[in-house]
Curated annotation (Swiss-Prot):
Gene Ontology molecular function, alphabetical: ATP binding; ATP hydrolysis activity; RNA binding; RNA helicase activity
Residues the entry annotates as binding ATP: A216, E217, T218, G219, S220, G221, K222, T223
Protein name, as recorded: ATP-dependent RNA helicase MAK5
Annotated Basic residues bias: 8-17, 752-772
The gene coding this protein: MAK5
Family: Belongs to the DEAD box helicase family. DDX24/MAK5 subfamily.
Catalytic activity: ATP + H2O = ADP + phosphate + H(+)
Composition bias, Acidic residues: 128-138, 663-673
Region Disordered, residue ranges: 1-30, 84-138, 663-689, 748-772
EC number: 3.6.4.13
Keyword field: ATP-binding, Helicase, Hydrolase, Nucleotide-binding, Nucleus, Ribosome biogenesis, RNA-binding, rRNA processing
């Protein structure tokens, strides 16, 4: 037997003395209660839950501090029984009462071993108990008097009268508009020295409480025209106290996600300079004015958290916002009590059948007279009364409506034959539609129409290239090489993007797609890449036609003509913004000629667009490059399609839990039109080899220099075009040897010489054959 020394025995005795005794808790018998004796609480549900169909659910109630046990009967059925459970508060008090005698007992044991140690432990325990009690009574503001809290709050949120005045001599053009001094300091920091025409007229009206309908050319600063009155109002209000959710004051509705995010960025950029400290640093704490976005394609949970935190301004697309409103009664109440409602690109937003959610959102802001319903006296319906139904729309809400076009004539489909308006009176205008759908508080809204003649800005020059449908790719490739710069190519379908994108990528052009089928993150990434590349090419549908303010877009190419004139105006408005020069090119095939004439007539043009000069000497080499790239694209498309069809067949068979005939996958069936057709191995090998050969051929063609007619590479000082000076000074064209470096803007005149509808010089006119 091992001996235990004195030191070890002493340690064991100390451990046994200090070991706390475990409290013995007696198990109480369960107390079952009936459903009638419980305290049921009604659950507040959304007022819009019935819109999507609630499955007949009219009302919900909930219970607290009740457990459920399931008892199985002889027949196998389960019956729920309610068990009374102690609430958390009572349970906490009992635990505290049980801990006190344990602490006293532990103190007695320690006293037997060491009296001094016990006294120190007792003091520490008493001190901790006092601190815990204080924390329970004052969780947030312990040790502060109410007067001190109010004083601290006033220091954190200073009085607005202490805002330093702005010296109008620094910005004399803005002196006539009485905006908040912080906004004018932001203008000075951003070198925004003078308002545009639409801003100088819309901002004073918005500040004085008027409803504004503004029509102005693209790139004229409409975003600031409606944003500045809102920010002026918000900066004039007291800051919301810490811990209190700030109310929603303004809602900006946009047709596309990209436009909504762009508007939010513009507002934040303006506020960044307006709210900066004198040192130019960002102020500490929550922002004075909070701006958030609610758009589709991004995390809905994150947007819900932003809304729950509270925002002064929300920029949203109607679809996602309405989805959140249907699930959140508090958000619906915030929209009903708005101070500002803004509809950007209004002509697009109010088109019939396009934005059904917009009408539902607008109805929330409409004033309606209270009517007694047949079920209002029913106690069940009274219990269902929600926060939204108890709220009322504001009488002082301001409505701002802005767009580049507000004309019904510009919204007609040009491919359809124009029909005479057979209704009584004149055809309703877009402004009349706005008055019907929007509840303007102003009896006579301020209508500002600054739309330019011809629909486009004066700094934009337009031209066209008439070609066959098959040669459009050739002339597009020529234009992008001949006039390098940031260009947007508009097409009418996503299929056109999917065809052009791999083609231009094979030709080593920096091209990026943008269409509605892309995920939102990918769309934003492509936009950022396009903005950062001075020679970037964006192939887009009309999703990029409205509102996007991309700096320094040199060219807009209408690969397919738009279906409406207002779409043409908005497409062309992506260039020539803020009085900068811009160029728009139309690629017109014979079957689009009638649409092009109708387009020009709807824009009240009297002359044809001038033709863009083409240097035909480059076309044969470009055509050969394009031919090889097209063959590669078709071969790759066939291989991708075959793999896709096979994968689809396997997934469908697995989903239906059926077996596939091996012949369908082994390629025994030689029908190339069948979805399960699989070429033989030797054919696949030949296909891969041919694609590799084509890629090598294209690589060699791309390395060859493109030389204009009359230029000699061996003898640069001879020939009809002397290029020796350009080679020495490096002033020639980077891609096309012998081509000039002039811009497309300088290659055409402002208007064409031929009248609209007149034949081309030298064209053979068809004679009408009259019947006998």
């Amino acid at each position: 037997m091992a001996k235990i020394d004195k030191k070890t025995k002493l340690k064991l005795n100390k451990k046994s003395v200090r070991a706390p005794s475990k409290p013995t808790t007696e198990k109480k018998p369960k107390k079952y209660v009936t459903a009638d004796t419980l305290t049921w609480k009604p659950v507040k549900t959304s007022s819009f839950s019935g819109i999507d169909g609630g499955g007949g659910m009219m009302m919900l109630e909930e219970l607290e501090d009740v457990g459920i046990e399931w008892e199985e009967t002889d027949g196998g059925r389960k019956i729920a029984k309610f068990v009374e459970v102690e609430s958390k508060t009572s349970k906490g008090k009992k635990n505290a009462a049980q801990e006190e005698p344990n602490q006293e007992g532990r103190g007695d044991d320690e006293k037997a071993s060491s009296a001094s140690e016990t006294e120190e432990g007792k003091k520490a325990d008493d001190k901790e108990a006092v601190e815990e009690d204080d924390e329970e009574e004052f969780p947030d503001f312990a040790g502060f008097a109410e007067e001190d809290l109010n004083a601290a709050d006033e220091e954190e949120h200073p009085n607005l009268d202490d805002e330093p005045a702005f010296n109008d001599d620094l910005l004399p053009e803005w002196s006539s508009i009485s905006l908040h001094p912080s906004l004018k300091r932001s203008f000075l920091a951003s070198s925004f020295t003078a308002p545009t025409a639409i801003q100088s007229r819309a901002i004073p009206a918005g500040i004085t409480g008027r409803d504004v309908v503004g029509v102005a050319e693209t790139g004229s600063g409409k975003t600031l025209a409606y944003s500045l009155p809102i920010l002026h109002y918000l900066l004039g209000q007291r800051k919301s106290k810490a811990g209190i959710k700030r109310p929603l004051s303004a809602l900006v509705l946009c047709p596309t996600r990209e436009l909504a995010l762009q508007v939010m960025d513009h507002l934040n950029a303006l506020l960044k300079h307006a709210l900066a400290t004198p040192d130019g640093e960002k102020p500490q704490g929550p922002p004075r004015v909070s701006v958030g976005s609610v758009v589709g394609g991004l995390s809905a949970q994150k947007q819900k958290r932003i809304l729950e935190r509270g925002c002064d301004v929300i920029v949203a697309t109607p679809g996602r916002l309405w989805d959140l409103i249907k699930a959140d009664d508090e958000l619906a109440t915030s929209v009903r009590t708005l101070r500002f409602l803004v509809i950007d690109e209004a002509d697009r937003m109010i088109e019939n059948g396009h934005f059904a959610e917009l009408e539902s959102i607008v109805k929330l802001t409409q004033r309606s007279t209270a009517q007694q319903g047949p079920d209002d006296d029913d106690p069940v319906f009274q219990a269902m009364a929600t926060l939204f139904e108890e709220s009322t729309a504001r009488e002082d809400m301001q409505t701002f409506v802005f767009s580049a076009t507000l004309s019904k004539d510009l919204q007609k489909n040009l491919k359809r034959r124009s029909r005479s308006w057979k209704g009584k009176g004149k055809r309703s205008s877009t402004l009349e539609d706005l008055v019907e759908k929007l509840d303007f508080r102003d009896e006579n809204p301020e209508v500002i129409d600054l739309s330019p003649e011809g629909g486009v800005v004066s700094s934009l020059r337009e031209s066209m290239i008439e070609s066959t449908k098959d040669d459009k790719d050739l002339y597009l490739y020529y234009f992008l090489l001949r006039y390098p710069g940031r260009s947007i190519v508009f097409v009418n379908s996503i299929d056109s993007i999917r065809r052009l994108l791999p083609l231009l990528t094979l030709l080593q052009l920096p091209v990026f797609p943008l269409h509605s089928h892309l995920q939102q993150k990918q769309r934003l990434k492509n936009l950022d890449r396009f903005k950062s590349n001075p020679k970037g090419i964006l192939i887009a549908t009309d999703v990029a036609a409205r509102g996007l303010d991309i700096p320094q877009v040199d060219h807009v190419v209408h690969f397919n003509l738009p279906r409406t004139a207002d779409a043409y105006i908005h497409r062309s408005g992506r260039t020539a913004r803020a009085q900068n020069e811009g160029f728009a090119l139309q690629l017109v095939s014979p079957d689009e000629k009638s649409v092009q004439r109708a387009l020009m007539k709807s824009l009240e043009r009297t002359h044809e667009l001038p033709d863009l000069p083409i240097e035909a000497g480059f076309l044969p080499s470009l055509r050969e490059r394009l031919r090889v790239a097209t063959e590669i694209e078709k071969a790759q498309h066939r291989a991708t399609k075959a793999t896709h069809d096979k994968n689809w067949l396997l997934e469908a068979a697995e989903a239906m839990d059926i077996d596939i005939d091996p012949s369908m996958l082994d390629g025994e069936d030689d029908d190339p039109d069948a979805p399960y057709y699989k070429p033989k191995k030797q054919d696949r090998g030949k296909g891969k080899a041919s694609v590799e050969n084509l890629k090598m051929e294209l690589k060699a063609l791309l390395q060859e220099k493109l030389v204009a007619r009359g230029v000699s590479i061996r003898y640069p000082t001879s020939g009809s075009k002397v290029i020796v000076d350009d080679l020495i000074k490096s002033t020639g064209h980077g891609m096309l040897l012998g081509a000039s470096t002039s811009k497309a803007y300088d290659q055409v005149e402002k208007t064409g010489k031929r009248k609209l509808g007149s034949g081309r010089p030298g064209a053979v006119k068809k004679k009408k054959v009259e019947g006998r």
